[in-house]
Structure formats: C-alpha cells, structure tokens
C-alpha cells in the first residue's frame, strides 16, 4: 500500500512560521503526499511551493470552531481558491447541529460547497469528539446531501481526535461514493492502517514522514 497517497501533510498550529510551512511543502514534494494542509494565511505560499507537482494545496475554513457565519465561510473558501487551494476542509456549525437546527447546518455546508463547486474538493469536519453517534450520523447525512466530497472526523484542536469506531460509522453513513478523512492524534503507521481499514481514504497528520517510514 502506498500510504503516502492517503496523507494530508498538516501544519495548523497558530505559531507556524513561513520557514516551517516551506519545510512541510518540501517534505510533501519529496514524499509525494496527497496534500499540504494549512491555515488560510499560507495558501498563496503553499500553492507557489507546490507548483508543478501533484501535491494539492488544502486550506481550512471556519477553523477550528466552525462558529463563523456561512457568509464568512463562503468568502474564506472563495479567497482560498483564488489563492490556489484545490481542497478545503471546513468545520460545521456544531452548536446548530446540537440544537437540531438542521437547516442552518445544511445552509452552512452548502455555502462552502457552492463556492467550491468544480474548483476544489470540500471536506466537512464534524468534530466527532463533541457529538453523539446520532449527531455524527446526521452531520454525515447532511454533508452527503449537499454534495460534499469528504466527511472528516476532527480539527485536532478539540477534546479528542480520530477513533476507528467513528470512521466506521461515518463510512457506513455516507456509503462508498464520498470520502472519509481521519484526523487528530494519528501519529504512527499502525493507527493510520486501523483508520484505513475502518473506511478512511485520507489521513490528516503532521507525522506523515514517520508514518511512511514505519510502513517500509
């Protein structure tokens, strides 16, 4: 298995410097990862660094709380795409989901999906550690309904990360036609493999190199 093709090589910590981001891009080029995932500020830099390679620029939207308005998320998406993003990882409105305001959740995801249509893949972060199983299923169903390309477990900034049980539930909910991304706390090959076996076809991790080296 070419594990590197599953990996979104990620640096989302607020103190990330330009030098660190450039280093990450070089690693992604060398290891042929799926993408480099960064905060919006670094979109242009990453796009420039990855030019002429198959590694995609992936940018987070409404991150990490998901509590921005849909208009702001749509604008963030538009700007990210203009600056070279080929994938966007958005955080849902978690409070609205808890309140069973499913129309709000739907419109929120839809705002990003509509902005990205035909230009970038959309991954929807549902933040599994804050949800009941019922809420996880609902978030996945809504994401699928509005045309998201992936559902994703976690931001890595909340109370917990990816669990294989959640990945399995998400995969069962969305079926085979959309992606499932496991992220948050995945630091070795063994865990990555467990996530893939549970149904993930993308892994978000800052430990991508370690994961690949362990797979050899």
Swiss-Prot record:
It catalyses: 2-deoxy-D-ribose 5-phosphate = D-glyceraldehyde 3-phosphate + acetaldehyde. Pathway: Carbohydrate degradation; 2-deoxy-D-ribose 1-phosphate degradation; D-glyceraldehyde 3-phosphate and acetaldehyde from 2-deoxy-alpha-D-ribose 1-phosphate: step 2/2. Pfam families: DeoC. Catalyzes a reversible aldol reaction between acetaldehyde and D-glyceraldehyde 3-phosphate to generate 2-deoxy-D-ribose 5-phosphate. The lineage of its organism: Bacteria, Bacillati, Bacillota, Clostridia, Eubacteriales. It is an enzyme of class 4 (lyase). Its EC number is 4.1.2.4. Gene3D superfamilies: Aldolase class I. GO terms for biological process: 2-deoxyribose 1-phosphate catabolic process; carbohydrate catabolic process; deoxyribonucleotide catabolic process. Belongs to the DeoC/FbaB aldolase family. DeoC type 1 subfamily. One of its GO terms (cellular component) is cytoplasm. It comes from the Bacteria. The keyword ATP-binding does not apply. This is Deoxyribose-phosphate aldolase. It is found in: Cytoplasm. The active site is at residues 89, 152, 181. Keywords: Cytoplasm, Lyase, Schiff base. One of its GO terms (molecular function) is deoxyribose-phosphate aldolase activity.
């Amino acid at each position: 298995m070419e594990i590197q093709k599953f990996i979104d090589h990620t640096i989302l910590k607020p103190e990330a410097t330009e030098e660190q981001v450039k280093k990450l891009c070089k690693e992604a080029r060398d290891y042929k990862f799926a993408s480099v995932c960064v905060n919006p500020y670094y979109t242009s830099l990453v796009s420039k660094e990855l030019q002429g390679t198959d590694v995609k620029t992936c940018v987070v939207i409404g991150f990490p709380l998901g509590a921005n308005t849909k208009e702001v998320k749509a604008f963030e998406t538009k700007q990210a795409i203009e600056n070279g993003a080929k994938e966007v990882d958005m955080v849902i409105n978690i409070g609205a989901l808890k309140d069973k305001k499913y129309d709000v959740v739907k419109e929120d995801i839809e705002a990003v999906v509509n902005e990205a249509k035909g230009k970038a893949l959309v991954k929807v972060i549902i933040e599994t550690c804050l949800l009941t199983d019922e809420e996880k299923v609902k978030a996945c169903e809504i994401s699928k309904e509005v045309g998201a390309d992936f559902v994703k477990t976690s931001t890595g900034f909340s109370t917990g990360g990816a669990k294989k049980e959640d990945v399995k539930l998400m995969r069962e909910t969305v079926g085979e036609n959309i992606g499932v991304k496991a992220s948050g706390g995945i630091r070795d090959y063994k865990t990555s493999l467990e996530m893939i076996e549970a149904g993930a076809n993308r892994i978000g991790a800052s430990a991508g190199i370690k994961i690949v080296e362990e797979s050899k």
